[in-house]
Amino acid sequence: MEQLKILKQSCQNAADISQKRLLSILKDNAGTEYGIEHHFSEIRSISDYKKQIPFSVFDDYKESVDRMMRGEKNVLTAYPISFYAHTSGTIGASKHIPFTERAAEIVRAYRSISEEAYAEYTLGKPPCMPSAPKMLYLATAREGHAPDGTQITNFSGRFIIEHKEELQKIAIEPELIFCDEQMDLPYLFALYALKEKELTGICAPFMAAVSDFFCYIEKHWEDLCQDIEEGVLRPDDRTSSFLLNRLGAELHPDAERARELRKIFQVGLDRPIAAEIWPSLRYVQAIGAGGFSSYTRIVRRFIGDIPIHMSVYAASEGLFGVSVQMNSPEYVMIPESGYYEFIPEEDADLSETFLRTHTLEMDQLQPGKKYELVVTNLSGFYRYRIGDVVTVNGYFGQSPVICFSYRRHQILNIAGEKTHEDMIQYAMDSLKKRVHINIVEWSACADYSTSPARYLLFMETDPEIEPYKKQKIRNLLEEKLSEASEYYAHYRQEEKLGPLKLILLQPQTFALYRDVQIWNGASPNQLKLIHVITNAKTEAFFRGLES
């Protein structure tokens, strides 16, 4: 529990450590092009920094990053670049975010945090982690290179690539993680995982991947058991025969394992089955809070009370927080990973001139309130508005304990009501309690084709809802959304917002949406569902799949 111990110590003086980190960043980067332009050498205090340095977004850096990728040095940062993180492109266009060696060191320091949290969770009592764990990584690590030769990959993929020497701990063929070819990954991940009886952990960047993994097994267990019994790989249009032959050469028939699995599945899948499939399974690790909470509920159906570690609070711009407890959606901010500022939610739309000098420090936050996070990282981004709004739940020493709430620009705002994701999620959760339906996923957008404008709420359920229940469900959603947002209720009463329209979707709509995103180049590791739709193309996709 070495890193947890270090974190606990640093959090006792978190605000001071974070501020000293800022002054160190400014000193180290005073000779860069950005540092000279913004007079880093003249900054002596936090107050000076806030007066001199503007807020920023990625577009402010894009031209500089392009130059860095062509080999120019000392543009945004003097620190050596480790790699460029290719963003998923699920929010706007994809980007290449510089990630320095200094930032990578922070990630490496916390890469065993799940094991440490699990050890603290069990207090050294059984079931402890085996001495030779077998982990399933539901992730891929594909890479490219910038014009100057620097590696381009996704955030999670980079740190898999770095630790190839530990592949003996992985319960699947390394080929599946590192291969650049198209392949039927859901089938291959499920097959290799089911073959490995001694699996100890299931890891993924986001809980959606774990949910998809279990749902695939639920639907295809008969074929999977047959292939395990025969020691063959099932042909598929997405996987080349060459790759199938290469992978298949490592498979061997296992009739005994197939019999064990069939016995489990034939009893029924309406109970937690993970511990029966893998008696040594200790935990699941994935980000499963906020917009991923619905996937966490699905995974719970399969794993029962096996603990979940919510991993880290991170983005392509850096690692900002870690979960220090099992089964908790909270993250402790890491003081040494950058300098953090916080904008109160209610102030987020005030003028930048005012906000620049009125951000709050780590030790000035009120538990229960929401704040927009502003980051100065170790990779050349200064006062960067990453767009996340977080809820502060308390403190761990002096460091804030946060939960992700919503993306600042992912809101519905027709008449000034500013409805964000967690308000609609509240309505969805309340609906499930009232009518006992299984909501696979949902998305929403503003519809200006009527007067007054209204919300469109796209919802997929399993099983599908009978048409005669649709109006009742719509009315309940309207009621619960009004409970969640007094402004929504107010503007509905004043008829500045029209009645919400519920659109029920065909089965597998959201699975198809994820497949389309991957087909268009999004990384499976980073794929995040956008609950609030802000572009016409995505809206048209969902409209076209109305049930």
In which residue ranges do the predicted regions lie?
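Active-site glycine/GP-rich loop and adjacent strand/helix microenvironment
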Residues: M1-S41, Y49-I53, G71, A141, ...
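Active-site diphosphate/adenylate-binding microenvironment
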Residues: K20-Y84, H96-R102, I113-P126, G144-G149
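Conserved adenylation A10 loop of the ANL superfamily
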Residues: Y84-P98, F213, L502
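Mid-sequence acidic-hydrophobic segments that form the walls
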Residues: T90, I113-Y121, Y216, H220
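Short secondary-structure capping/junction motifs at helix and strand boundaries
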Residues: K95-P98, Y118-P133, D223-D227, P307-I308
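Long, hydrophobic, well-ordered secondary-structure blocks that form the structural core
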Residues: P98, A103-Y110, H309, S316
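Hydrophobic alpha-helical transmembrane segments of membrane proteins
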Residues: Y110, A117, L188-F189
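Conserved nucleotide-state-sensing and coupling region of NTP-binding domains
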Residues: M129-A146
